[in-house]
Amino acid sequence: MMEVSYPPLSRADFSAIWSFIVNQGGGAGVFTFKPDGYKDARGTVTSCTSAVEAVGATAITVTMSGSLLQGDYIKFASHDKVYVVTDDLSGSGELSIFPALIAATTAAAVTFDDVPFAVSLTSDEQQFSRGPADLHEFSMNIIEAV
């Protein structure tokens, strides 16, 4: 689960976010979220392709230029789950991930920058507050929807 907090927003800026959130229908809606500070790999990776791996694998054979670092997020082309890299890897080899694969991978490109998380709101009810200078404060809790 992630808590996402927005800085104080003008009514115009807040209204765009609020209308999107209420249109999700609470926890029933699924949308794409790319968290600032986490959506891009910290390593030097410029290309990465996975081999075919079975459900349950935690070591994925990859052909890679550059490096992925512990804590980087990745997504395989074959499904929507996002995984975290658990050990640094430079160049091609066995990439350690968490959790174990929930679906088999295909021999395809691995997304390591601008990683899209498929998420849902954790509650059907959302709140905001309006503070001084008509600035709106809003936070939401989301969870990966896979």
Give the ranges of each region predicted by the language model.
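Extracellular/virion structural assembly segments
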Residues: 1-146
